[in-house]
Amino acid sequence: MLRVRCLRGGSRGAEAAHLIGALVGRALSGRLSRASRSSSSSAAAQLPLSAHEQVPEPTAEECPVCAHNEWDPLEEVIVGRAENACVPPFTVEVKANTYEKYWPFYQQYGGQTFPKEHVQKAVAEIEEMCNILQHEGVTVRRPEPVDWSLEYRTPDFSSTGMYAAMPRDILMVVGNEIIEAPMAWRARFFEYRAYRPLIKEYFRRGARWTTAPKPTMADQLYDQDYPIRTVEDRHKLAAQGKFVTTEFEPCFDAADFIRAGTDIFVQRSQVTNYMGIEWMRRHLSPTYKIHIISFKDPNPMHIDATFNIIGPGLVLSNPDRPCRQIEMFKKAGWTVVTPPTPLIPDNHPLWMSSKWLSMNVLMLDEKRVMVDANESTIQKMFESLGIKTVKVSIRHANSLGGGFHCWTTDVRRRGTLQSYFL
């Protein structure tokens, strides 16, 4: 039987905010007392703040950002954009995360836009997805359009950009805090810029905002000799805990983490290293516990098409990539569901992902799920679980590397912080 424990006081952010507010208040009081000795300083201290300068502290009742898990009723969501999407240059970290049959595509088109007609179809699909989300009562927000074809240079590398299609990769909401992830692909170095207007708005309205240490992405972050010619090579290396990213500096994609209240599960992957996981552990403790889990996966990158938590004590577990720690979940009373084989045809291009995007679903609440209209078998699986399916077709959007979970970041879900893993 699944055990659930409610925590008093909401998220850790509220406590921290009040403590910081008190400390800042004392500091300001001392400063103003000293400043009163000077007439000029006193006058300056009495100047009122403009509306734009007044930034409120977050409260659980009013904060526009609040999510504790993957299934509470969804109220607001960021949905990515396919516009201007560019093929990333074929660097070692891209090679390690893509299938060999697509390597000629990257070699030919790296730095250029994805096929125009395909992107146009993806844009139309995501627009329809947004319309359906709004029809289901969810507020939809979008990142800014950006020209990703522009080349940029840092002291360590040069690259063109990629897209702002997958907010799940870069943004993670934990309680009332938005965390910007220090992603590992050089083509995604400036992706955060598309989301900054939204994040600043949420911050001004009371959300907490944290940016993890930005990696330099110097050559030392990548194993330049990483052997990835065959799937067998990848299986052996992953089993040995060896990946294309080194431990030179912290890096992680937010999509390698998945939330279940006070417990957050993460995998070490091609884009998330142990330093990145340790940074998150220290940042979120003691309220949240980070659990590292692993899978029989030759190409680990993003957990949500391998292990997708869809309800309290309910998880989809990919049969092709079994979780090595699955008994831990069963002992905790969780129900482990094996999704059916995806129906996506072999000839459909999936430049950055596998067919298992069929299980990369978005829960609107415990009893509603957004699922691909073409995947009839997984629809039946959800219906057998008593979950209503909201059907949308995003086949062309899938080609850019994500399903419904990838294409979104849930900004606000109505619920409280609880423990589901005791």
From Swiss-Prot:
Membrane-spanning ranges: none
Keywords noted in UniProt: Membrane, Mitochondrion, Mitochondrion inner membrane, Transferase, Transit peptide
Functional pathway: Amine and polyamine biosynthesis; creatine biosynthesis; creatine from L-arginine and glycine: step 1/2
Signal peptide stretch: none
Catalytic activity: L-arginine + glycine = guanidinoacetate + L-ornithine
EC code(s) of this entry: 2.1.4.1
Active site: 253, 302, 406
Family affiliation: Belongs to the amidinotransferase family.
Role, per record: Catalyzes the biosynthesis of guanidinoacetate, the immediate precursor of creatine. Creatine plays a vital role in energy metabolism in muscle tissues. May play a role in embryonic and central nervous system development.
Protein name, entry field: Glycine amidinotransferase, mitochondrial
Source organism of the structure: Danio rerio (Zebrafish)
Lineage: Eukaryota, Metazoa, Chordata, Craniata, Vertebrata
